[in-house]
Amino acid sequence: APFAMNHSDWSKKDLEYIWHPCSQMKDYETLPPIVVDHGKGVNLYDVDGKRYLDVVSSWWCNLLGHSHPKINQAIKNQLDSLEHVIFANFSHRPAITLCEELMKKIPRGLCKFNFSDNGSASIESAMKMSFQYHYQTGNRQKVRFMSLSDGYHGETLGALSAGGLDLYSELYKPLLLDIVRIPAPDCYRCPRGKKRGCCQAECIDAAQEAFARHGDECAALLVEPLLQGSAGMRMYPPAYL
């Protein structure tokens, strides 16, 4: 019976059938995947009952902890009324209510919401929207994009093109878009020898030069908000943003 299997059994079965994302499958020969049974708060428990502290918040997505009673109840309530509906030509009250509440918290000038199911897909949609905007307003030469060096935007082709980390993109370079790359600010290892808080944000000069040189052909600039996570948690200087 499946529930009579131990953690080692489940790990072997996992590796027989599954490719895991963002990892080297060869590493699993010596460090098998942890097979999780359930979670509670900040803790995860494997199928043998061993407890783990979820210090990465399940890839930064679980801000309120596992099995939060309010969230669980809301999910159960929703399942009893509507589990899924096509979003083209249809809508539903939870989506409308959510957008209405979010509108109260976002900066002025932003007035519409577009849903996607993951970060990479949202980047792809944003790139297509920005291109289409310029195409429909007579700027059809704007067919390229700018992004910062060492950035990370996702694993799909457009998002991977915008990223600046060879660890993720080196193999796929023949497939990727031609991106205008701008040197990212790095206050910890400032190439100009400046100190954060005492400089004039000279790192913006490279961005201004890129805009002057390539602005007429670029549809958008892609920037991670607040910091570059995969580059080593690099915080942007406020003046740069």
Question: Over which residues does each language-model region extend?
Answer:
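A short, flexible beta-alpha/helix-coil linker loop
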Residues: 58, 81-82, 186-189, 225-229
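Active-site core of PLP-dependent enzymes with the aminotransferase class I/II
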Residues: 199-200, 206, 227-241
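Glycine-rich loop-to-alpha-helix module at the N-terminal edge of alpha/beta enzyme cores
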Residues: 7, 51-140, 146
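PLP-dependent aspartate aminotransferase-fold enzymes
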Residues: 100-219
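Active-site and channel-lining beta-strand-loop segments
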Residues: 33-55
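Short beta-strands and strand-loop turn motifs
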Residues: 53-56, 183, 220-226
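Short acidic, glycine-rich surface-loop motifs adjacent to enzyme active sites
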Residues: 214-232
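Active-site-adjacent loop/helix segments that line or gate small-molecule/cofactor pockets in enzymes
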Residues: 3-40, 90
